[in-house]
């Protein structure tokens, strides 16, 4: 009896077996993930840089606030007022206002003398010597002067006009230099020898003055100058 032999079915496919097998779509997904990671890294880097810059500015602000606190006075309110006054003193410009006094009329032909402390008079950043305002800081100054004039009739021996002027003394020139001058005649106002007349002369203008230069007021025939409580005749200057 013959043995039955079972033979498996074998299918042989003849073809090229050296072609590599590749899976579609895998490399494209890897490239997309790499780009996303790079973008996320750049975003995190920018956020870190922004936080670092913000921290630096906050640290600078903290240091500056500490410096300001150390400069502030620790005393009472008077210290604050003193600090404010000191700061204002550095900011204000030189100024002076001088008033007429009984000693203004020297009778010697020199410049008029002035009160520097009493009443409305003050000096700030300028000095005073023998009727002259002495400039301590070069610059442009508005200088002014007013004198009250008065008398009875036409004064004997009076020239044709009364001269009221502001003059500058400078080391660079031996004589006084005219800055502002006014001339007027009171005799035209006095129609009779017994009539009382009043008048005033005001001068004001901007001039350039150097440190060390002086400004004085002169009135030819000063016996006509009238003084009263420092409001009728005065002299001053301030930097502009």
UniProtKB/Swiss-Prot annotation:
A GO CC annotation given for this chain: cytoplasm
GO MF entry, a single one: cytokine activity
Modifications made to the protein after synthesis: N-glycosylated.
Residues that carry a glycan: 102
Membrane spanning stretches: 38-58
Induction (free text): Up-regulated after T-cell activation.
Tissue specificity statement from the Swiss-Prot or TrEMBL entry: Predominantly expressed in the spleen but also found in the brain. Weakly expressed in peripheral lymphoid tissues and in heart, placenta, liver, lung, appendix, and kidney, and no expression seen in fetal tissues, endocrine glands, or nonhematopoietic tumor lines.
UniProt xrefs under Pfam families: TNF
SMART domains linked: TNF (SM00207)
Oligomeric form and interacting partners: Homotrimer. Interacts with TNFRSF14.
The protein, known as: Tumor necrosis factor ligand superfamily member 14
Gene label: TNFSF14
């Amino acid at each position: 009896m013959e043995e039955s032999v079972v033979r498996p079915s074998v299918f042989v496919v003849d073809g090229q077996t050296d072609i590599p097998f590749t899976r579609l779509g895998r490399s494209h997904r890897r490239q997309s993930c790499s780009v996303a990671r790079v973008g996320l890294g750049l975003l995190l880097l920018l956020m870190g840089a922004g936080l670092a810059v913000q921290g630096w500015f906050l640290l600078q602000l903290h240091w500056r606030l500490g410096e300001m606190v150390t400069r502030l006075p620790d005393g009472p309110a008077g210290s604050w007022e003193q600090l404010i006054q000191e700061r204002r003193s550095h900011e204000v410009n030189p100024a002076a206002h001088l008033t007429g006094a009984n000693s203004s009329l020297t009778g010697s032909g020199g410049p008029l003398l002035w009160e520097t402390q009493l009443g409305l008079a003050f000096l700030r950043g300028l000095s005073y010597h023998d009727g002259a305002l002495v400039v301590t800081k070069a610059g442009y100054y508005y200088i002014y002067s007013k004198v009250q004039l008065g008398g009875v009739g036409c004064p004997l021996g009076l020239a044709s006009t009364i001269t009221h002027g502001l003059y500058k003394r400078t080391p660079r020139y031996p004589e006084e230099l005219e800055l502002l001058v006014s001339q007027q005649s009171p005799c035209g106002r006095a129609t009779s020898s017994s009539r009382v007349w009043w008048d005033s002369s005001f001068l004001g203008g901007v001039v350039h003055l150097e440190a060390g230069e002086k400004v004085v007021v002169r009135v030819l025939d000063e016996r006509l100058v009238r003084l009263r409580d420092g409001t009728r005749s005065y002299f001053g200057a301030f930097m502009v």
